[in-house]
Amino acid sequence: MGTTWSVQYVSATRADLHALHDAIQARLDVVVAQMSTWQTDADIMRFNRASAGDWFALQDDFLQVLTTALEVASASDGAFDPTLSPLVAAWGFGAHAEVRGRPAPADLVAARARVGWCYLQLDSEHHRVRQPGGVMLDLSAIAKGYGVDVVARLLRGRGIEAALIEVGGELYGYGRKADGTSWRVLVESSPDEEADSEGLEPRVLALDGLAVATSG
């Protein structure tokens, strides 16, 4: 997903840190291999290159995230759209962006013509999605949060009672720290944002069974 991760945890039993690190990395590698737009051989990029009319087989993580993404797209009437990749790139963001800046009107028209979550045909029963032709998926707005969720499930499965998990600015905290307090994170503006505006007033958020997305 073109980013980093970190985990802080509390456990009554001693864990093998190297084994735990490797297990977390391996689980996230599975997510990355399916949904990272930063890897040309990832499943999502192979779907984006598929020919019009092709049915593309989905592995479990990809299917779950895409299903949720399409549900949110429908519920938000397209305010959330996992097919926005051409527009994201046109404005200079994402893994395949060129120079950041205002795109030419003709480029925006061309990009918009390839955007539309409703063009996708998802066959959940057979774990596949149909490429309508030229549609490019980008699940960056949801895949990192999913990565946090799968790490949390892994830690709980290993008996870890409390943890703060962060993947590229998406955080989830559960349980309490050794001193009995909740996990706390500081949210503040980046230096670039502060230079351009008044910025965001710093806030401390307590996370106990709660998540927060701070990126982008």
Predicted regions and their residues:
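Mature catalytic core of soluble alpha/beta enzymes
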Residues: 1-216
